[in-house]
Amino acid sequence: MPASTYPPSVDALARRLAQQREFDRLPRTMLVDAVRSAVATAPSEAESTAVDLARLATRRLLTSVINGTGTLLHTNLGRSPRPLPTAVADRVRATTIELDLATGERGSRHGAVAELLVDLTGAEATVVVNNCAAGLVLVLAALAHGRGVVISRGELVEIGGGFRIPDIIEQSGCRLIEVGTTNRTRLADYQRAIESNDVAVVLKVHPSNYRITGFTEEVGIATLATLGLPVIGDLGTGLLDASTPWLADASGQQPNVAWIRQEPSVREWLSEGADVVIVSGDKLLGGPQSGLVLGRTAIVATCAGHPLMRPLRAGTLVMEALQETLVAYGRNDARSLPFWEQATRSIAELRGRATELVDAIAKDQVRAAECSSTPGGGTMPNTQIASYGVRISGSYVDALRGWSVPIIARGHDGATWIDLRTVDPADDEVVLAAIRAINFGL
């Protein structure tokens, strides 16, 4: 058989690919898989096919991108942007996740985080799990296993990924008791359900990813608290306090974030009588993915002692990142957090950055333009935040996404938009280089 008819050596080809810088992040096993697939499907073009497959494999790895969509809490991009915890970035040492340095004895992983959350929200106690849905499962299992959970039909929400509140209630070992109708639920509906069923708790779910308007009626936390049963509030969105005292500057001046003032907060629901409130850490809090369970000491203690607490608890990296987030709040310096920095950027600043980029490109197809950002992350539907960005005539979303540092842009109205509200100013040069190279070859 002529030598040219033999398939190339998988090992040799994998070694050649490993020498290419663009594949530095790929482990050898993935390079070998790419080469084997290429040899099996296109032996005569094995090397070029293997390169293509290796590039696809590289793209499947988690990597940092530039969010130019204008969605502050983009679920597909990890929701609230955040740097690595200082403790992780600065050293490779052990951490006092469950050690009390004062006594040398075993401590609680919630220590300082719990103290900070109590100060910031008015809660009596708190525990942290790995996300909001986990928090709801834990609370329901601890307080209502085998018994009824009463909830308005207008609050039987579905969150991302097809997960539904009724299914979560069922998996918690509880019995769902629906009351009212989709658009109108009254106190009497809850009362009748409690009188005729074995009800353990009342569940109030904030419909954060949709709105029901028009001929509507709902029962607030304060009224539900008169029913004589524990009230669980699934707030989800994670706003600690609608007055945002931690955003004020040294003179007490608040930034223009009027769009958030009508959003219910943890402090509000607790003060109105909720026994426990559950929120996400990576939404309007601006921290890592986590679920915060805040409320009365006895209830939180019951949750902390439940067998599900162990498998659902947050890990060390999450607790460190959450602690740093809350310390910024405690210092009234929440604007230093990436999410709040983006949310509070002024139109003047954004317009100036857009103008500088457009002037540097100097092409008729590219101009600075007004646009609208959105909170995202299943929060505040229909809320628009005035913004500014770069508008490129034509469709270049795919090209920008394929840049060395992927830029996630938005296609709309025959143009490609890069909303600068969600782009770090330090990345403006990357955006400039990408637009020049991909579109105009400058």
Whereabouts are the PLM-identified features?
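Long amphipathic alpha-helical segments
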Residues: M1-L61, V65
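Glycine-rich phosphate-binding segment of PLP-dependent enzymes
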Residues: V35-R36, A40, G68-T69, R79-T103
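Conserved PLP-enzyme active-site core in the AAT-like
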Residues: G104-T316, E320-V327, A434
